[in-house]
Amino acid sequence: MRVNVTLACTECGERNYITTKNKRTNPERIEMKKHCARDNKHTMHRETK
């Protein structure tokens, strides 16, 4: 079952990306490095509710 999740920047808190994940294979929150437009650099983005 794939669900839509929002990724938020850990430094500024802005929600920049929307992606999908499979809850069965990845039950924990996902983290990935993405570009933050507000900070203008690559930062860690974490899944939010």
Swiss-Prot record:
The gene is rpmG1. InterPro entries: Ribosomal_bL33, Ribosomal_bL33_CS, Ribosomal_bL33_sf, Ribosomal_zn-bd. It comes from Staphylococcus saprophyticus subsp. saprophyticus (strain ATCC 15305 / DSM 20229 / NCIMB 8711 / NCTC 7292 / S-41). One of its GO terms (molecular function) is structural constituent of ribosome. The keyword Zinc does not apply. Belongs to the bacterial ribosomal protein bL33 family. NCBIfam families: PRK00504.1, PRK00595.1, rpmG_bact. The keyword Ribosomal protein applies. One of its GO terms (cellular component) is ribosome. This is Large ribosomal subunit protein bL33A. Keywords: Ribonucleoprotein, Ribosomal protein. GO terms for biological process: translation.
